């Protein structure tokens, strides 16, 4: 036989010098830089073998092989390094004689990953690393001998990831391309999976090419890493849940991907799911066991059904009965026997006792004698049912505890017995006591007790007794049986007790009705009070929202009105003073044409001199409010009975409350009387009613006290809110005043550029402040002396009192706008002489706006206004001033500021030379005062003109 040995191509492999410190990712980058050692390997490829007998193969001597093929002598050594020899004849072939015998047992495959003991491991090699060849042995082309199986997989290499490929192809081009493709495939496989979960292991893979040649390649096969417990030093901030992708959790739990891969919620859900699956597995195993046992039972039942025997099982509370087998051959006969058995059982009892489900309870047994009972349904099926081969389900009844009943009291016991009429009917039928008419019984007793009527109503034992009973009184008709036979107690009801109970029930109903009425009344009172509070709040809101200082002809209710001092009938002027109030007031204008106070003194305005207001009530000096008459205060305003006065409407105070209180008292009295009459019949009921009434009174009192406390709290809160609102308004007004003053200064500066010879501008020298605050939104304009009068500004800087009446001095009076008709303001009180000034005392700063200042009886040579600001008025005003010998200033304001130590401020009167004509200013804008003692009467003079006032 001829064997032809084809020698494979020499393949070289480069290795870096230091592989212990080299990573798999750096092999490509360091391939060209690091020094390498060229290793040449020779492989033998055997192909096209004839059929060889076994005896011939065993006789082959190994020496006839090529010297390049090295066969190790030791069976334990599978890998030997080759010497570095150049290959000069890569494609040589040798011919083997036909007499050559080959022993395949002696030809062993060399493993690439097993080393001899004397050699070093690849991790310790520094400079030279031997390469290893994997020669193949000849494979005959018969069915008996095939290629040897691949060696077992070696242990995983931790650091070495170099791919070693061995090919046995004959062409150089095919070997290089296949190596490159394999490397690319390995890289793609590794890159496609997460490096954390997989690691590469070198595994030899043998395959055959298209030409039938075999080649072996060591491939990097990714193997899934084993789960390792995470260390305690792991950065938990970088963790994220694999399920919900959250990073904020109190605890990390184990998931299918490993520990610390699920958040707390997802981990608990996963653990629960795993537990359910385990339980389901156990349940399925148990169900399989039960199915096996059930199959055996069903087989037995099928055998019984085939024989026509019923499988009836029953369970009771005391014992368990086994299945009873009846000798019935066919189902029809079985049913017949069943019906006969049923008829026998039911013949012993009354038909009415048998229920639809075929059960029978204890009949005629008292509660104390009730014990565990057997029911027929435990061993008997209904007639309309068919035997199915399954046992009938029964319910176990537990014995109920015996109820302890006291003598003389009714105990409502619950027991599982038929109704009374059914028991009676059953006993009657059992004892042949028919309901048809029979012989008349004995005379029944007339007493109402049901226990003693039996002996007198039954008569002879042989006769039948009708249900209608004997006796003229009918005592035996409803009471045929004693309590010993029926098993229940007889109740004796007294008529008196029934009547008393009925009376108690009726009285209770009346008491409940009275309670409901009182509660309704209290509820109505509370609602009325709440409505009144809401109305007051609405009125206050309206007052706060109204810009009353900016509106023309806006008037409030006047308390007292003012005319000239020539008429002494004015009530306030006769006493020479203003009343003292504790709440803010307005000063409003009064018609200048009115010259007397007769109309006011007749009832429109009360005599309020020397009166003080304390808690919404006016008191005089003696402490009695009698002089006020029928005038009352509502919402900080006066009201009286006279409807003709538009400023004083007639409104009564608390009229609704008084009527409600009276009605409530009357209702209470009536309810008490009715209760007393009803309670005379029954003392117990009277006590109960009184108890309820007292409780109701206490409830009403507590409700009233609660309402009062709530009202007081609400009033206190409202006062606080009002104070806060006032403070806020004051702050806003002060800011507005500052802004207005700045605007005025800017206007005065702008007007100074356009002054003519007739226009003279002054300077402001306001330096004083006041303890009271001005609640106005108007723009003040200060008056200054006219330059035509040749008066110095010093005459207007201060005003002091030098008159007969003692008054406090003023400081800081400044005037910006010229005074056209008066020569000057004097610093002393002249009591109406030579156009001087009268200072009358009122305790607050004064602001006046349009149509504020009216000067009467000025000199004729001063009637024509020379200032351009004054000329802005209509000419009609000047003509009227000339005709009436009066002059007025409009569209301008002046401001009087008091010193902090003053108790009053002055109203300046510009008077002509004569003291007989005393005239005053009339203000058309409210003056708001915020002091406890608003007005003082000690500093008033006879020449003063009083101003109209009213509450806010």
Curated annotation (Swiss-Prot):
Keyword Metal-binding in annotation: yes
Pro residues: bias regions: 148-157
InterPro entries, sorted: Znf_GATA, Znf_NHR/GATA
Region annotation (Disordered) ranges: 1-36, 138-197, 380-418, 433-478, 634-699, 732-816
Biased composition (Low complexity): 158-196, 445-467, 654-668, 678-699, 732-745, 763-814
One GO MF term attached to the UniProt entry: sequence-specific DNA binding
Zinc fingers (GATA-type), renumbered ranges: 241-266
Taxonomy, superkingdom: Eukaryota
Biological source species: Dictyostelium discoideum
Pfam family, one: GATA
Name of this chain's protein: GATA zinc finger domain-containing protein 5
Keywords, comma-separated and alphabetical: Metal-binding, Zinc, Zinc-finger
Basic residues: bias regions: 393-412
Source taxonomy: Eukaryota, Amoebozoa, Evosea, Eumycetozoa, Dictyostelia
Polar residues: compositionally biased ranges: 10-24, 634-653, 746-762
GO process terms (BP): regulation of DNA-templated transcription
Claim: Zinc is one of the keywords in the record: yes
Biased composition (Gly residues): 468-478
């Amino acid at each position: 036989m001829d064997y032809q040995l084809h020698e494979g191509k020499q393949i070289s492999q480069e290795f870096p010098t230091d592989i212990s410190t080299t990573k798999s990712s750096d092999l490509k980058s360091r391939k060209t830089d690091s020094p390498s050692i060229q290793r040449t390997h020779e492989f033998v490829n055997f192909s096209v073998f004839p059929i060889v007998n076994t005896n011939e193969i065993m006789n082959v001597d190994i020496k006839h092989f090529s010297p390049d093929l090295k066969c190790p002598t030791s069976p334990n050594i599978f890998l030997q390094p080759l010497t570095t020899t150049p290959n000069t004849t890569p494609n040589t072939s040798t011919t083997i004689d036909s007499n050559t015998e080959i022993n395949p047992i002696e030809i062993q495959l060399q493993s690439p990953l097993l080393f001899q003991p004397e050699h070093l491991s690849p991790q310790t090699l520094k400079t030279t690393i031997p390469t290893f060849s994997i020669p193949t042995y000849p494979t005959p082309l018969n069915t008996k001998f095939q290629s040897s199986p691949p060696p077992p997989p070696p242990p995983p290499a931790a650091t070495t990831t170099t791919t070693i490929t061995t090919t046995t192809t004959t062409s150089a081009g095919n070997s290089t391309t296949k190596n490159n493709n394999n490397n690319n495939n390995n890289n793609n496989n590794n890159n496609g999976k997460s490096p954390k979960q997989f690691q590469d292991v070198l595994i030899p893979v043998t395959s055959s090419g298209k030409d039938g040649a075999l080649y072996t390649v060591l491939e990097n096969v990714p193997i899934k890493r084993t789960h390792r417990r995470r260390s305690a030093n792991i950065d938990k901030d970088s963790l994220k849940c694999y399920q919900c992708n959250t990073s904020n959790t109190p605890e990390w739990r184990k998931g299918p991907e490993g520990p610390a891969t699920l958040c707390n919620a997802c981990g608990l859900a996963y653990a629960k799911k795993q537990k359910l699956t385990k339980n389901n597995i156990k349940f399925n195993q148990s169900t399989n066991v039960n199915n096996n046992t059930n199959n055996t039972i069903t087989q037995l039942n099928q055998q019984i059904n085939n024989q026509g025997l019923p499988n009836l099982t029953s369970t009771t509370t005391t014992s368990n009965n086994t299945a009873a087998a009846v000798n019935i051959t066919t189902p029809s006969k079985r049913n017949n026997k069943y019906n006969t058995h049923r008829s026998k059982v039911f013949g012993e009892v009354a038909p009415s006792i048998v229920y639809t489900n075929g059960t029978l309870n204890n009949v005629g047994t008292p509660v104390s004698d009730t014990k565990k009972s057997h029911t027929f349904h435990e061993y008997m099926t209904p007639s309309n049912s068919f035997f199915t081969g399954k046992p009938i389900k029964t319910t176990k009844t537990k014995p109920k505890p015996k109820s302890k009943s006291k003598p003389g009291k009714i105990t409502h016991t619950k027991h599982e017995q038929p109704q009374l009429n059914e028991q009676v009917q059953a006993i009657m039928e059992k004892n042949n006591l028919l309901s048809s008419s029979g012989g008349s019984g004995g005379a029944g007793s007339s007493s109402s007790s049901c226990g003693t009527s039996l002996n007198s109503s039954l008569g002879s034992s042989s006769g039948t007794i009708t249900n209608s009973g004997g006796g003229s009184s009918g005592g035996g008709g409803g009471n045929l049986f004693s309590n010993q036979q029926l098993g229940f107690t007889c109740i004796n009801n007294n008529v008196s007790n029934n009547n008393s109970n009925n009376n108690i029930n009726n009285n209770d109903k009346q008491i409940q009705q009275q309670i409901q009425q009182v509660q309704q009344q209290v509820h109505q009172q509370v609602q009325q009070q709440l409505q009144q509070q809401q109305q007051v709040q609405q009125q206050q809101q309206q007052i706060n929202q109204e810009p009353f200082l900016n509106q023309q002809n806006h008037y409030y209710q006047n308390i007292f009105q003012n005319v000239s001092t020539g008429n002494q009938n004015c009530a306030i002027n006769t006493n020479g003073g203003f009343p003292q109030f504790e709440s803010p007031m307005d000063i409003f204008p009064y018609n200048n044409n009115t010259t007397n106070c007769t109309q006011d003194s007749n009832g429109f305005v009360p005599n309020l001199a020397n009166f003080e207001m304390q808690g919404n009530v006016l008191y005089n000096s003696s402490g009695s409010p009698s002089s006020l008459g029928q005038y009352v205060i509502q919402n900080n305003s006066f009201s009286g009975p006279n409807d003709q006065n538009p400023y004083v409407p007639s409104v009564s105070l608390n009229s609704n409350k008084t009527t409600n209180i009276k009605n409530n008292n009357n209702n209470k009295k009536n309810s008490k009387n009715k209760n007393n009459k009803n309670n005379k019949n029954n003392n117990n009921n009277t006590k109960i009613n009184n108890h309820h009434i007292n409780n109701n009174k206490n409830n009403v009192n507590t409700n009233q006290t609660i309402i009062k406390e709530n009202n007081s709290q609400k009033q206190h809160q409202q006062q606080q809110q009002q104070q806060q609102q006032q403070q806020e308004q004051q702050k806003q007004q002060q800011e507005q005043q500052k802004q207005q003053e700045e605007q005025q200064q800017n206007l005065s500066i702008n007007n100074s550029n356009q002054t003519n010879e007739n226009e003279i501008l002054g300077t402001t020298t306001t330096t004083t402040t006041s303890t009271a605050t001005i609640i106005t939104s108007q723009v003040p304009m200060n008056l200054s002396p006219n330059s035509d009068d040749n008066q110095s500004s010093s005459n207007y800087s201060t005003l002091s009192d030098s008159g007969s009446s003692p008054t406090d001095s003023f400081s800081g009076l400044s005037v910006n706008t010229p005074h056209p008709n008066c020569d000057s303001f004097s610093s002393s009180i002249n009591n109406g002489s030579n156009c001087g000034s009268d200072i009358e005392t009122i305790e607050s700063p004064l602001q006046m706006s349009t149509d504020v200042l009216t000067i009467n009886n000025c000199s004729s040579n001063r009637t024509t206004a020379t200032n351009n600001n004054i000329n802005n008025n209509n000419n009609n005003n000047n003509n009227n001033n000339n005709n009436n010998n009066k002059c007025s200033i409009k569209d301008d304001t002046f401001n009087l500021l008091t010193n902090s130590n003053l108790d009053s401020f002055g109203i300046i009167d510009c008077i002509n030379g004569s003291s007989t004509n005393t005239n005053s200013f009339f203000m058309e804008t409210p003056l708001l005062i915020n002091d406890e003692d608003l007005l003082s009467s000690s500093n008033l003079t006879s020449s003063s003109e009083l101003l109209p006032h009213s509450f806010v």
